[in-house]
Amino acid sequence: MKLFGLFLSFTLLFLCPFISQADVPELSRQPPRPIVFVHNDRSKSDPQQVHISLAGKDHMRVTFITEDNKVESVVEYGKQPGKYDGKATGECTSYKYFFYKSGKIHHVKIGPLQANTTYYYRCGGNGPEFSFKTPPSTFPVEFAIVGDLGQTEWTAATLSHINSQDYDVFLLPGDLSYADTHQPLWDSFGRLVEPLASKRPWMVTEGNHEIEFFPIIEHTTFKSYNARWLMPHTESFSTSNLYYSFDVAGVHTVMLGSYTDFDCESDQYQWLQADLAKVDRKTTPWVVVLLHAPWYNTNEAHEGEGESMREAMESLLFNARVDVVFSGHVHAYERFKRVYNNKADPCGPIHITIGDGGNREGLALSFKKPPSPLSEFRESSFGHGRLKVMDGKRAHWSWHRNNDSNSLLADEVWLDSLSTSSSCWPSSRSNDEL
């Protein structure tokens, strides 16, 4: 049985490129890099794959996995190392995927917590101590942003560069582990990102590589993703883990699902409409959106794949004066002007593709020529981005290219919040009322 399971695992890994729901024409890409598989070096009762995520106002969700099913879903925490004056009990789950069975996946919500404060915590009543820092409640606040991570040497370089400078929240617009039905790669990915994801909240949305539909064998989509990466959808009144929102300081961030229904009759559309309507731009001057398949793209890779979603939802984002839209999917970097309905518009969001995390498929090297006048910067390189929101009016965006041991600043721009632009709001909602 073990040999058959091993054979099956490698078979699934070989087949995954052919069963992916994101097939595109052959592209000019760098040669694929081998996967960096991170093995488990802890006991069955020790927590592993620890990561944290925001879970509503002043709360954090701690997720960890144990191989021992007897370990309780508890987290002890406090402001001093080894001294835990808080304790919370959560829930647990597990799942099966053909012959694979996951460990016990624990989700524990802790709080209330103080802003901009370091907490020390222990999971399951055993194992090593971790620490995290809560985001600030006021400006400035900084987000590290990258999509399409995977787990290769490229990925390791990206994570190292991100970790070399402080930030408050990590944003990932889809395509996490690139497990593609090979479930042990989900475990390896969790161990790979734990040094970062256990210290700062990781807020993610799904990409096509999280679908993991397999004919006959597995019809439930996003099974692994939903079990392992529980996001604050209930806290933001969403009925699905595939789309949700959260607030940090004065920034409202919306995570959308490119691979679930998005037409005007869908739950996601109705939720998004209600969510954006509740944002008070006086207290929350910035609105940022993340999704996987880009709505604007001048690369030959995945050309037009986000068009249906753009046609369905773009007006909602435009009418709400969303400031920036981040996407992944295309394994390159590209920054657009403020745009709406395929035209430059000073009241539309800036669109940025940041699908350059380092996955095994390599880079999408073929940009269309001549470049679109809407595209201001584009490059096929691995790297990551940082959005530092200085105050209610100004933010600084920078893209850092991977260059072996260094992280080089390759693109940057200052952004003005649309909440401060009186010309972008109807007279009934003048700037004085924002």
Curated annotation (Swiss-Prot):
Pfam families reported in the protein's UniProt record: Metallophos, Metallophos_C, Pur_ac_phosph_N
Subunit structure comment from the entry: Homodimer.
Tissue specificity statement from the Swiss-Prot or TrEMBL entry: Expressed in roots, stems, leaves, flowers and siliques.
Broad EC category: hydrolase
A molecular function GO annotation: metal ion binding
Gene name in the database record: PAP22
Sites where the protein binds Fe cation: D148, D175, Y178, H331
Glycan-modified residues: N116, N403
UniProt-annotated binding residues for Zn(2+): D175, N208, H292, H329
Entry keyword set: Glycoprotein, Hydrolase, Iron, Metal-binding, Secreted, Signal, Zinc
Sequence similarity: Belongs to the metallophosphoesterase superfamily. Purple acid phosphatase family.
EC number(s) stated in the UniProt entry for this protein: 3.1.3.2
Catalytic reaction equation(s): a phosphate monoester + H2O = an alcohol + phosphate
Classification via InterPro entries: Calcineurin-like_PHP_ApaH (IPR004843), Metallo-depent_PP-like (IPR029052), MPP_PAP (IPR041792), PPA-like (IPR039331), Purple_acid_Pase-like_N (IPR008963), Purple_acid_Pase_N (IPR015914), Purple_acid_PPase_C_dom (IPR025733)
Binding residues annotated for substrate, in chain numbering: N208, H329, V330, H331
Domain of life where this protein originates: Eukaryota
A GO CC term attached to the entry: extracellular region
Subcellular location, record wording: Secreted
First-listed, main subcellular location of the protein, grouped into a coarse class: secreted
Name of the molecule in the record: Purple acid phosphatase 22
Active site: H302 (proton donor)
Disulfide bridge map: none
Signal peptide: 1-22
Cofactor(s) annotated in UniProt: Fe cation; Zn(2+)
Cofactor binding comment, as recorded: Binds 1 Fe cation per subunit. Binds 1 zinc ion per subunit.
Annotated SUPFAM superfamilies: Metallo-dependent phosphatases (SSF56300), Purple acid phosphatase, N-terminal domain (SSF49363)
